[in-house]
């Protein structure tokens, strides 16, 4: 498993999803955050260490790694961030990771 290649594919999917959302809907003014959670057996496992190498960090929840910047959108719209995080998680899921998008309003 080449985690860097998977990350690059997922990040490209996230960027494309963010851009497509903005093109279709603009930037809704609902502020918030979105991220990707990946469930692992242990946060010091090989899988978790590989995820950490591409920017994931240990979550406050047990056996979970998360990534807060999935694409390259730097605005505040939660909807745009959710689109990117969802696309990123879908790519990881395709490669066998238990990945999900998380979000919360600001």
Question: Where do the model's predicted regions map?
Answer:
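N-terminal leader/targeting segments
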Residues: 1-57
């Amino acid at each position: 498993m080449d985690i860097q290649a998977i990350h690059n594919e997922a990040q490209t999917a996230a960027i494309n999803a963010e851009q497509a959302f903005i093109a279709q809907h603009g930037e809704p003014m609902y502020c918030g955050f979105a991220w990707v959670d990946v469930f692992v057996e242990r946060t010091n496992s090989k899988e978790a260490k590989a995820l950490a190498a591409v920017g994931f960090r240990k979550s406050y929840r047990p056996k979970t790694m998360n990534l807060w910047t999935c694409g390259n959108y730097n605005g505040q719209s939660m909807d745009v961030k959710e689109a990117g995080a969802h696309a990123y998680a879908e790519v990881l899921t395709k490669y066998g990771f238990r990945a999900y998008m998380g979000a919360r309003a600001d």
